[in-house]
Design a protein with these regions (language model features):
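HAMP signal relay modules and closely related sensory coiled-coil linkers
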Residues: 4-19
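Short helix-loop "hinge" at the ATP-lid/N-box region of the Bergerat-fold HATPase_c
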Residues: 141-146
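Membrane-proximal coiled-coil signaling linkers
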Residues: 24-75
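Acidic ATP/Mg2+-coordinating residue in the GHKL
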Residues: 168
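Short alpha-helical Gxxx[C/S/T] motif in the catalytic ATP-binding
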Residues: 196, 200
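Short conserved segment of the HATPase_c
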Residues: 173-185
């Protein structure tokens, strides 16, 4: 909206509208990039899955093809779950609360991805499935950035909180991306759909916790703090 007005109330209003239009344009561009990436993320494993299923059709005893097909199907299932969780707003609602040892959850996620873990026990009140989803998203993001050997998962007790850290030795996150890293469709240098970190942020908030990131070339650390149960504090 072009204007040549003095800095009065109307002029400031026009500037605010322009800022809003720019924000909407950027959001639309992120959405288009996400749709393209999500289509690619689904199409690629589908091609792999169909290929291995074809191999199984010719040789039902091919266990390697079966393992790969199962792993690929699981990857697709998680992506679809992420999409549905955000679309329905389910991340913040309908938590199935239990006493959860965050250290156990961290070790499970680390084992799934083949990365190192140093996890103390720390009991929190939370949804075990959502907390595992949070861990999986952070660890998968780190593995994309640095490979399995460059990732460390840690859990320790810190005053009245459990502190979870996922560290990688990848190239780091561009400084201009950091302020919007946990927004939907914000994609880091490692690629991906831009959903994982937004979901991790929503899960942490839903559990009364917080998530933050510190990054420089060669070292990125995501930190999640969750309230410990009173008897653990």
């Amino acid at each position: 909206v072009p204007h040549r007005l003095p800095q009065d109330e109307f002029g400031r209003m026009v500037e605010a509208v322009n800022a809003l239009l720019q924000a909407l344009k950027e959001a639309k561009e992120r959405e288009r990039a996400f749709l393209a990436e999500a289509s690619h993320e689904l199409r690629t494993p589908l091609t792999v899955l169909l290929g291995h299923l074809d191999r199984l059709g010719r040789n039902p005893q091919d266990l390697e093809a079966l393992r790969t097909a199962r792993a690929t199907a699981e990857r697709m299932r998680r992506l679809v779950e992420d999409l549905l969780a955000l679309a329905r707003g389910e991340v913040e609602r309908n938590l199935n609360l239990h006493i959860v040892d965050l250290g156990e959850v961290a070790r499970e996620a680390a084992l799934e991805h083949g990365v190192a873990a140093e996890a103390e026990s720390g009991e929190v009140l939370g949804d075990p499935d959502r907390l595992l989803q949070l861990l999986r998203n952070l660890v998968a993001n780190a593995v994309r950035a640095a490979g399995k050997e460059g990732v460390r998962v840690r859990v320790r007790r810190e005053a009245d909180h459990a502190l979870l850290e996922v560290e990688d030795s990848g190239p780091g996150i561009p400084e201009d991306l950091l302020p919007r890293l946990f927004q939907r469709f914000a994609r880091g240098p490692g690629g991906g759909t831009g959903l994982g970190l937004a979901i991790a942020h929503a899960i942490a908030k839903a559990h009364g916790g917080e998530i933050a990131v510190e990054s420089r070339p060669g070292r990125t650390v995501f930190r999640v703090r969750l309230p410990l149960l009173e008897e653990e504090a």
